[in-house]
C-alpha cells in the first residue's frame, strides 16, 4: 500500500513540476519578446522560479521514501 501511495505522490509531483516549469519558462519568453533589453533580469528571475518549482518534486520524493519505509 505504501508503494502505491509513493508512486501516486511522485506522479503528481512530476506532473505539477513539469507544468510549473512550462508556465514559468513560457512567461519568461513572452517577456523577452516584449522587452529584449530586460532579458538578463528575466533570465535570472526565471532560474529562481524554476528552482522554486522544482523544490516540490524533491520534497515529494523525500515524503514518498518516508511513506514507503514506514
Swiss-Prot record:
Keywords of the record: ATP synthesis, Cell membrane, CF(0), Hydrogen ion transport, Ion transport, Lipid-binding, Membrane, Transmembrane, Transmembrane helix, Transport
Listed transmembrane segments: 4-24, 47-67
Keyword flag Metal-binding: no
InterPro entries registered for this protein in UniProt: ATP_synth_csu_bac/chlpt, ATP_synth_F0_csu, ATP_synth_F0_csu_DDCD_BS, ATP_synth_F0_csu_sf, ATPase_proteolipid_c-like_dom, F/V-ATP_Csub_sf
Entry-linked PROSITE patterns: ATPASE_C (PS00605)
Main localization (coarse): membrane
Annotated site location: Reversibly protonated during proton transport: 54
Membrane topology, from the record: Multi-pass membrane protein
GO cellular component terms attached to this protein's record: plasma membrane; proton-transporting ATP synthase complex; proton-transporting two-sector ATPase complex, proton-transporting domain
A molecular function GO annotation: lipid binding
Annotated compartments: Cell membrane
Quaternary structure and interacting proteins, as annotated: F-type ATPases have 2 components, F(1) - the catalytic core - and F(0) - the membrane proton channel. F(1) has five subunits: alpha(3), beta(3), gamma(1), delta(1), epsilon(1). F(0) has three main subunits: a(1), b(2) and c(10-14). The alpha and beta chains form an alternating ring which encloses part of the gamma chain. F(1) is attached to F(0) by a central stalk formed by the gamma and epsilon chains, while a peripheral stalk is formed by the delta and b chains.
Recorded family membership: Belongs to the ATPase C chain family.
Function as written in the Swiss-Prot or TrEMBL entry: F(1)F(0) ATP synthase produces ATP from ADP in the presence of a proton or sodium gradient. F-type ATPases consist of two structural domains, F(1) containing the extramembraneous catalytic core and F(0) containing the membrane proton channel, linked together by a central stalk and a peripheral stalk. During catalysis, ATP synthesis in the catalytic domain of F(1) is coupled via a rotary mechanism of the central stalk subunits to proton translocation.
Name by which UniProt lists this protein: ATP synthase subunit c
Classification lineage: Bacteria, Bacillati, Bacillota, Bacilli, Lactobacillales
Gene name of this polypeptide: atpE
